[in-house]
Amino acid sequence: MDGIQTSDSSHHGIVENSPYRTPYDRYAEGGQLGASWYFSRKEIEENSLSRRDGIDLKKESYLRKSYCTFLQDLGMRLKVPQVTIATAIVFCHRFFLRQSHAKNDRRTIATVCMFLAGKVEETPRPLKDVILISYEIIHKKDAAAVQRIKQKEVYEQQKELILLGERVVLVTLGFDLNVHHPYKPLVEAIKKFKVAQNALAQVAWNFVNDGLRTSLCLQFKPHHIAAGAIFLAAKFLKVKLPSDGEKVWWQEFDVTPRQLEEVSNQMLELYEQNRVAPPPSQGNDTEGSSASVVNQRASGKAPGSSEEPPTHENHLAPRQSSTPGHQGYDHPHPEKQNSSQRVPQNDARDGTANSNEGPNMSSTMDAMKKIDKDKVKAALEKRRKSKGDVAKKVDIMDDDDLIERELEHGVELAAEDEKIKHERRQSWPHSAHREDHQGVARLTENTEEGELSIDSQEYRSPELDNRKRKDMHEHRNYDRGERDLKRLRS
């Protein structure tokens, strides 16, 4: 692990010479915590401190995805919930919003963020475990690394680095450790919809997980991201979302059509960057929710616009991860869109970033035409049957319990043949839950240090309990933080 830049930090949470010069006010915008963490996409991309140090946008995007993959691997090996992994990723995104990649090793900072996230989410892991596993992942191509980190001198050096890094991260974040994720609003909304709940929740969940690799959490509020994930998941599964009654479905999220369109487009961009040609005649064999590839994009509009909503069909294929192909979006009825209940398309940001122009939504993907929700249902049924007598003893559950149970265990779809797996090796890891984590060890040698192969890694779905999160932003011992900072600079 490399060193950490500390000279640009201040105890107010503002980096000297940072483009984000607004004083850090935890209670900006009517007392809403964390309001200062939202910026427009243009601000994030053009004012990055990394850009000033010679790191272009493409390189920075690669580094962002790299530490996200590293954190996913680290979190699974530490056996922490997906919510903890997501919190660590958000901490990392926020850190590099105010610090440069050129002056801070991404994997060292990521390790610190995982250690910190474990405590924030009340799923702490021993510092020793975090250090050992992180070191092994970083030096996975070095057979001697496992034994080297067990040497007292090497271990103490890494321990000191992580503890130093923790102070730097806390100072850079302004001791604001409060993070909210899209998972809760996503599940609550789907419970209200009562349409294909299990499959829709799982696919949308996968979109949220993959969206962590982008800067969406720095632009949009959690419920806006949840709306975008449900929008894409419904298109992938060809599920009709509620469009009658007092509200159309997207109004449940207090999101405008412009915000919904922008979130959806940015999620799709993630898959376009891993574009590969879809395999011929594999429509039925590779169905599922999966992060794979996007072929092309055409134009369209989000719900509530004057034109017909998008029908993203050229988006991904196989594996249960997150990027599904989309077809047959059932949008709100025109009369609903023109009624007084329609959300006006204004430029109000509401704490999110909206650009005047942005990529349009996509349409028709040949590889996804044969995908339907029956395949997903069949996969669920197959998994239940595979559990044998144990499954037969499970009591009948209500819809809410079933959704949460399915999200915990994931939806296992039909496996691809080796050829298809190979063609998708460069895409984002599978997003389904894996209970035993043993597959994590099977990393391919051609992946970048700290990154995973699609065939060897899967996501864990967050645990949907009602555990009350501690409000970590209060009383974080500011005096100690200032004292530590002075020691670092002395």
Curated annotation (Swiss-Prot):
Keywords: Cell cycle, Cell division, Cyclin. GO terms for cellular component: cyclin/CDK positive transcription elongation factor complex; nucleus. Residues 282-298, 352-365 have a biased composition (Polar residues). It comes from the Eukaryota. SUPFAM superfamilies: Cyclin-like. GO terms for molecular function: cyclin-dependent protein serine/threonine kinase activator activity. Pfam families: Cyclin_N, CycT2-like_C. This is Cyclin-T1-3. It comes from Oryza sativa subsp. japonica. Residues 367-391, 457-490 have a biased composition (Basic and acidic residues). Residues 275-391, 414-490 are annotated as: Disordered. Belongs to the cyclin family. Cyclin T subfamily. Signal peptide: none annotated. GO terms for biological process: cell division; positive regulation of DNA-templated transcription, elongation; positive regulation of transcription by RNA polymerase II. Transmembrane segments: none annotated.
